[in-house]
Amino acid sequence: MDYVSDDFAPSNILSCNDDSGDHPRNLIPELCRQFYANGWVTGTGGGISIKYNDQIFIAPSGVQKERIQPDDLFVQNLNGEDVIIPKPEKKLSKSQCTPIFMCSFTERNAGAVIHVHSQEVVKLCLLNPENEVKITGLEMIKGIYNEKKGKFYDNDEELIIPIIENSKYEKDLVDTFKIALKKYPSTSAVLVRNHGMYVWGSNWKTPKTQLEGYEYLFKIAIFKKIPPV
């Protein structure tokens, strides 16, 4: 295991001195700033992980997401073993979401996973005592990927997103998360009641755009459920 060096190239396993905006070292901090501006990762909440060259880049836990720097990230292999960690003086810890991230990578072959503490998700779950949310008839459904069919939904199809119950610790969500993945093979997201949402895709662009689509759909779903004053 190595520490991050000043040029972000601490080993010959993976060159991290890539200036490309799409490199996880640069991309994760940028996306976290965008998500913070949208109100999805405030108060140190939320997280993101991206697979790159068979290695997993993970944002740190318990930090202000809008202030994450490229050398704050953790890198581990597909077996969950740390390969590169931030320098000790930073006193950072790996995201508590890591077990769910890894579950998405192994169970769904995801390329990226995003976790947000969206107020819209929490509101929608409060309005839905059931263990799923059903949405129909909206154009933005076409922006959501059906993992079972391997294509995006049509706007006349029913979109079903599972809800699992929250737990004291993120790692304790893994079992119910796996059950939801098996029960809902079409889903690209899981809602956690009173908590937030996990969304994933084959690359970083897919969960980002789907997250935006889900937020839109959830706002409309909430509007339809709340009776007019």
Swiss-Prot record:
UniProt main location, coarse: cytoplasm
Cofactor: Zn(2+)
GO molecular function, one term: methylthioribulose 1-phosphate dehydratase activity
Swiss-Prot/TrEMBL catalytic activity: 5-(methylsulfanyl)-D-ribulose 1-phosphate = 5-methylsulfanyl-2,3-dioxopentyl phosphate + H2O
Keywords from the named record: Amino-acid biosynthesis, Cytoplasm, Lyase, Metal-binding, Methionine biosynthesis, Zinc
Localization per record: Cytoplasm
Family named by the database record: Belongs to the aldolase class II family. MtnB subfamily.
Name of the molecule in the record: Probable methylthioribulose-1-phosphate dehydratase
Annotated source species: Acyrthosiphon pisum (Pea aphid)
